[in-house]
Amino acid sequence: MGLAIAVGSFLISPFSKVIPDPVVDINPVSTTARGTEKAVFAGGCFWGLEAMFEEVRGVKDVQTGYSGGTEATANYARVSGGGTDHAESIEIVYDPAQVSYGELLKIFFSVGHDPTQVNRQGVDQGRQYRSAIFATTPEQKQVAQAYIDQLEESQAFDQAIATEVNDFDAFYPAEDYHQDFVQRNPAHPYVLVHDLPKLRKFRQQYSDKLKAQS
């Protein structure tokens, strides 16, 4: 991750957009019989995405990792060097009876990252930081592409959406020190500048989607 440190009182404003609900979504009746489902997203540094989706009601687990590459293995050193074409990704295990795939997509596009940036997110540059959706089922691919088309037609963003929609191939969990990074390192400079503002914006915009506080 690139370290963009706050200078003086300057802080990076987190990306956020108010966008419409997906018109097309997966019927929960068709998925609940299978139990939990998985969604795999890539949108810049995976630390903040993981922390954000862990707070969504109906999400059971989130892991950071790597998807979408050309090699049958992945680790941070190889991925960050651009040698495998994997993207920093998160794997979300969720209960479709509590949160739909379309709802996860809306959060991903509106607060999770800026989907108009090509092969980067802010200070983080390279294919490993691209915007991508790795559909684990044909239904997910259909819903994701339909939502992108809907957002484009409604001109929800000032620029074209750069998000790639690909069939899921594999997910390689990231190293242990990358798991729950924001929770374990709240004072890390990158977290302070980029991830905590994103979390605050998410909590404000989606207060009705948060897990109950224990």
UniProtKB/Swiss-Prot annotation:
Signal peptide: none
Oxidoreductase in keyword set: yes
Keywords for this protein: Oxidoreductase
Catalytic machinery residues: C45
Annotated Pfam families: PMSR
A GO molecular-function annotation: peptide-methionine (S)-S-oxide reductase activity
Catalytic activity: L-methionyl-[protein] + [thioredoxin]-disulfide + H2O = L-methionyl-(S)-S-oxide-[protein] + [thioredoxin]-dithiol; [thioredoxin]-disulfide + L-methionine + H2O = L-methionine (S)-S-oxide + [thioredoxin]-dithiol
One annotated GO biological process: protein modification process
The EC number(s) this enzyme carries: 1.8.4.11
Family the UniProt entry places it in: Belongs to the MsrA Met sulfoxide reductase family.
Function: Has an important function as a repair enzyme for proteins that have been inactivated by oxidation. Catalyzes the reversible oxidation-reduction of methionine sulfoxide in proteins to methionine.
Protein name, UniProt field: Peptide methionine sulfoxide reductase MsrA 2
Organism: Synechocystis sp. (strain ATCC 27184 / PCC 6803 / Kazusa)
Lineage: Bacteria, Bacillati, Cyanobacteriota, Cyanophyceae, Synechococcales
Gene of this entry: msrA2
